[in-house]
Regions:
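Switch II (G3) loop of P-loop NTPases
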Residues: 81, 103-120
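Hydrophobic anchor at the beta1->P-loop junction of P-loop NTPases
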Residues: 31
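P-loop NTPase switch/communication element
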Residues: 65-82
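Short beta-strand-centered segment that lines the nucleotide-binding/catalytic pocket of NTP-utilizing
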Residues: 53-68
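Conserved catalytic-core segment of NTP-binding enzymes
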Residues: 115-217
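Extreme N-terminal, non-catalytic leader segments
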Residues: 1-28, 96
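Hydrophobic positions on the alpha1 helix immediately C-terminal to the Walker A/P-loop
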Residues: 41-42
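Conserved glycine(s) of the Walker
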Residues: 37-38
C-alpha cells in the first residue's frame, strides 16, 4: 500500500533538520495549568520573541472571563461569546485556519477550560495535527503544590493530549522566597509517575525565572521589548534604567533556559 505524501507523522516532525528555520514545521502550542502559574506571562514572551525574529504566530485568547492576551496583542483572536458551542466552533476554525496558513498557533484558555480536552478526545487531536504537518506541543505550568499535577494527569491519562513534545515548566514565581527551587520541586519530580512518563518519552523540564519588575510592566500594558527600550503608555513614566536592565537580563535568561526546546516553540 502506498504512503500518502501529505501525511506527516509526529516522529517525522520531531526529527526534521531544525537548523533550517524555513523547514521547521508550524507549531500548535497549548499552555495549560492552574491560575497564577505563569502560562499567560510565558505566552506573551514567546509570541513577542517569535514575532521579533520574523516568525508569524496566530494568537488566540480563549479566556472568556479575563482576556489578558488581547490587551497586549490587538490582533489576537477571541470567541464572540462564552457559550461552549461558540467557543468550540471558534477553536475548530482556528485549527483549520492554521493548517491552511501554515502559521504557528498558540491558544491560551482560562484555567479549567475543557475545550481542548473535548477536541483531543473527539478528534485524536495530536495525531490529526501531525498528519497535517503541524507539530503539537503542550506546556504544563506548575508550582510546588502537588495539586498542580492534576492537570498533567488529566492530559496524560489515556494519552488524551500527550504529544512527544511535552514541556513541564516550574515557575520560580510560585515558590516562597526562602525555599530553593531544587528543594521546592524535588518531591513532585521524584514521586510523580506522570512526570517520569513525560521524561521517558523525551519531554523536558524548564524552570522559568522571575522578572522582579513584572508588575510595573503589567501596569503599563507593555511588551517586554517596549519595556527594555524605555517606552511607556498612558501617564506612567517609563521604567528606570535598572528595571530596563532587569528586563533585558530576564529575556536572555528565558532564551537560555528554553534553548533545549527552542525548536518546539513558534
Amino acid at each position: 500500500m502506498g504512503t500518502n505524501p501529505d501525511i506527516v507523522s509526529e516522529h517525522d516532525l520531531l526529527n526534521e533538520d531544525e537548523e533550517h528555520i524555513g523547514t521547521r514545521p508550524p507549531v500548535f502550542l497549548f499552555p495549560t495549568g492552574r491560575g497564577n502559574r505563569g502560562k499567560t506571562f510565558f505566552t506573551r514572551w514567546v509570541v513577542e520573541d517569535a514575532r521579533n525574529m520574523g516568525r508569524e504566530v496566530i494568537v488566540a485568547d480563549g479566556d472568556c472571563t479575563n482576556q489578558t492576551l488581547s490587551a497586549y496583542f490587538p490582533d489576537a483572536s477571541s470567541p464572540s461569546s462564552a457559550d461552549q458551542v461558540t467557543v468550540t466552533k471558534w477553536f475548530e476554525e482556528l485549527i483549520e485556519a492554521q493548517i491552511k496558513s501554515r502559521k504557528s498557533l498558540i491558544v491560551d484558555f482560562g484555567a479549567g477550560d475543557r475545550t481542548l480536552k473535548h477536541a483531543a478526545h473527539d478528534l485524536s487531536l495530536d495525531t490529526f495535527l501531525s498528519h497535517h504537518g503541524i507539530r503539537p506541543v503542550v506546556i504544563h505550568f506548575v508550582g510546588p503544590d502537588p495539586d498542580d499535577l492534576a492537570s498533567l494527569h488529566s492530559f496524560e491519562t489515556g494519552n488524551l493530549f500527550a504529544p512527544a513534545a511535552t514541556i513541564i515548566v516550574y515557575n520560580q514565581f510560585a515558590i516562597p522566597p526562602h525555599v530553593p527551587p531544587s528543594a521546592a520541586f524535588a518531591n513532585s519530580v521524584a514521586k510523580s509517575t506522570v512526570i517520569q512518563q513525560i521524561l521517558d518519552r523525551d519531554g523536558e523540564i524548564v524552570v522559568m525565572p522571575i522578572l522582579g519588575c513584572a508588575h510595573e510592566i503589567e501596569r503599563r500594558r507593555l511588551g517586554f521589548i517596549e519595556a527594555a527600550e524605555g517606552q511607556t503608555k498612558g501617564d506612567l513614566p517609563s521604567l528606570g534604567l535598572i528595571d530596563r536592565q532587569r528586563v533585558r537580563l530576564w529575556q536572555a535568561e528565558m532564551k537560555s533556559r528554553f534553548s533545549n526546546v527552542a525548536s518546539w516553540l513558534p
